[in-house]
Swiss-Prot record:
Gene for this chain: y04D
Organism: Enterobacteria phage T4 (Bacteriophage T4)
InterPro entries recorded: DUF5484 (IPR035141)
Protein name (Swiss-Prot/TrEMBL): Uncharacterized 5.1 kDa protein in Gp55-nrdG intergenic region
Pfam families per UniProt: DUF5484 (PF17583)
Length: 43
């Protein structure tokens, strides 16, 4: 299992900015990419 996917599902991340627009159709991979660019993983 992908570590970032597991961290995302457990809510172990922080965001520096909130996403703009409609995120209801975002996949887990979309969120992981956004967190990589605009947040931090809590490991």
């Amino acid at each position: 299992m992908n570590i970032k996917r597991m961290l995302f599902k457990q809510g172990l991340y922080t965001l520096n900015v909130t996403p703009k627009g409609d995120t209801t159709k975002w996949s887990v991979n979309d969120w992981i990419k956004f967190i990589d660019e605009n947040g931090n993983w809590e490991i």
